[in-house]
Amino acid sequence: MPPGCTTDCVTAVADGGYPEVFNNESVDGSFGVTSPILLDTITPSGHTMRTLDVPSGPNGDHLVSSFSSKSELGLNLSTNGSALTFMGYVAPVGAVDVSNSNTPGVVDPTNPVGESFYRAVAELHGNGSFSYTETNAYSGNNGRAAILDSADNKLFMSGNAGNGSNPQPVGVIAGAGAQLTTPSTLPESEQQVGQPTPMGGFNITALGDKADKVGKDDNFRGLTVHDNVVYLTKGSGGNGVNTVYFIDTTGKACPSGVGLPVPGAPLPTSGLSYNPATLQSTGLPENMCVLAGFPTATKSTTSFPFGVWFANDTTMYVADEGSGSNTYDAATGSYTDAAAQTGAGLQKWELSDGSWKLAYTIQSGLDLGTPYAVSGYPTGDNPVTGLPWAPATDGLRNLTGEVNPDGTVSVWAVTSTVSGATDEGADPNRLVRVTDHLDATSAAGDTFRTLRTAQSGEALRGIVYVPGQ
């Protein structure tokens, strides 16, 4: 391993059994195994009504996930609510290290994974049919979410790129972060896939900080559109700022890197213009801002935003996935760093006096840092890490919500985990729900309820509320 390697190849330390197979990450940092994607339709209380298998066979259009890539498969409705979108890989089930492979049109020769696979956006239409749009973006890493702008027939995407040495190739830098493309109506086998089209760029030099690795400031996870503005989050990686961003299509919102969207600004309709000759040294042009009030500290160890949901123009909820630290205390039987976090969970932010302010964070019921049992999952300790297999909640990732007639909001989210697994993205996680009052000033009385715990061999990723279903 990795597949296709020519130098520095390693030997697997575990066979294909779950979850032990992911111990191979201890010798292969790119390790992952592609898996089928299942879409569950559930009631607000968590009852599963039906399950739809996303086509994953080799004969015809198909898409898979890269289990255990925990940042993937964000679900979003199109801007007019007519289609559901998400991202995956055009690869067979059971393929290894696909999430760190190159894309066919953007090959980094220093990437240790010597294989290439397109990333693709899947659209699920109201009649139950799928269509797919392949892209060369996110070479070396993963596309995480997509939203269809129905009015202009454009796809907005978020993700990360690069799995090789520095400086990264031009195509990798241009194919990172916030991307834009036009949906295809052709079968995957007939699509002519061009070069990536970046629609947003951010550089920490806009905040007065010293430049770091070009392309890695644009390592985005969450993606949403509200009031004609594209918002993205960054919550991981050793570069840049973990915070909430928006794309400024006016060039006037944030002369110093921080600001608020300009009222009436249009959504992006075209990609950024950039000079390939200088991209490796200067990065993409900057047209993104840190949302005023959100963190601006580089390489944060306390802020890990993922999903964003707006209840209205002045109230937004942000899922913080936690630090990922699996420091464990055998005496108390808990993951102490996870349990001690104050920002992990569901953050409620309110806009006032030209800036967003954190009102409070809802954690009750998440049992941060407390291990839980999963039927069929190993007990005891993982011999590779010496820590318990049992996962514990570390925070929240993707989320969705609905404003209720009585002035409350219901928020559903999937959890992040810590454990003794070598790759915690392979942990069975949970779907949780909480009710909050829009006019509340504290989290008193707000408690999460677990609606579903993933089974052994399963991971929960995206969640979206579909009105009227």
Regions from the PLM with identified roles:
Residues M1-Q469:
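Sequence/structural signature of beta-propeller domains
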